[in-house]
Curated annotation (Swiss-Prot):
One of its GO terms (biological process) is cell motility. The keyword Cytoplasm applies. It comes from Bos taurus. One of its GO terms (cellular component) is extracellular space. The gene is SRPX2. Residues 1-23 form the signal peptide. This is Sushi repeat-containing protein SRPX2.
Amino acid sequence: MAIQLTRRGALSLLLFLTPAVMPTWYAGSGYYPDESYNEVYAEEVPQTPILDYKVPRWCYTLNIQDGEATCYSPRGGNYHSSLGTRCELSCDRGFRLIGRRSVQCLPSRRWSGTAYCRQMRCHALPFITSGTYTCTNGVLLDSRCDYSCSSGYHLEGDRSRICMEDGRWSGGEPVCVDIDPPKIRCPHSREKMAEPEKLTARVYWDPPVVKDSADGTITRLTLRGPEPGSHFPEGEHVIRYTAYDRAYNRASCKFIVKVQVRRCPTLKPPLHGYLTCTSAGDNYGATCEYHCDGGYERQGTSSRVCQSSRQWSGSPPVCVPMKINVNVNSAAGLLDQFYEKRRLLIISAPDPSNRYYKMQISMLQQSTCGLDLRHVTIIELVGQPPQEVGRIREHQLSANIIEELRQFQHLTRSYFNMVLIDKQGIDRERYMEPVTPEEIFTFIDDYLLSNEELIQRREQRDICD
């Protein structure tokens, strides 16, 4: 039938149509014909190009950026990309080759491998504490980084590091060390006068001004000496402060506190007397009281005060022998003369021949020094009226005064009796028999002496020996 095609006719039609559906193929380009899903064609094996060693550009010309290709062709000369050519690849300084170091132009019109040059870099340097660095070319090859430290710090280690070809930095990482001591300024030295009646002065001051030249941190401030607001005794006192920073660097400063005491000339005790003074006895505000020994009384001011002008107030008194006035109207008037001045030992006996009386008077006459030292005056009441005698030393008492004394002190005429009266007029001890002066002195020393008298007794312990 006319509509049927023979097998031979059908094959001829397919061969005729094939060139119309095949795209252009560029030998050595590396590309292959595209397939079209809209067309159907007979599958064929690609044609193998004919090898020709004479073609000068069998493979594409090698061009490696930031590098160089050194090629050796079997043809020699200028054949750098002919079939069989072998090229050695290298990079410029500062670049590293990534890929094949050697490639060859293959029959497939391709090179046997790929490679490229990558710029060499070192890792970014870490920042150092209390310091910094500057680099000439960042992290690239041959870049030099110079280190520096903040004010107050010293660089220890490599001052510069260079980026080397192996991607490492030369040297080691330095450190910034705080070597500068803190700055410290103490307050000015000062001088102060002691207060009245005191030998010390309270002194205040502001704390020192301290600053660290590095990070500004002061870890410790120590004081050698009294604290501000303390009481300072007379003289010069050195106050020292020491400051420490974090690196244990230290700095010190000092100033002087001087305390002065206004003093008056040293007073001398009066003849037959002594002084008792407050405080140091010669400093501003001190008060000195004048006292007279037993048997003497003071004439003049009782005390003097050291003034701010460094002079004593008033004039010095004197101690004169005590005058006893027996021409008084009563026993009370007689005793008032001894109030706070003398102690009284009143002896009563029936008659001058009384054995106890004679024994007691004999012992007391041998101890007049001890009696005067303890401010003791003896009053004798001896005999019976109208021949009764009363006397104080050489002074005779009237009969009226004798009677009042007996009644006031409860002294009988019937037998020997004796009473010891203190400086306040109080009956302190009674005796019915003679006693030794040592017993009387012991009682007075143990119970009747004032603090001032105790001090004087210690100073005059051997005066009667």
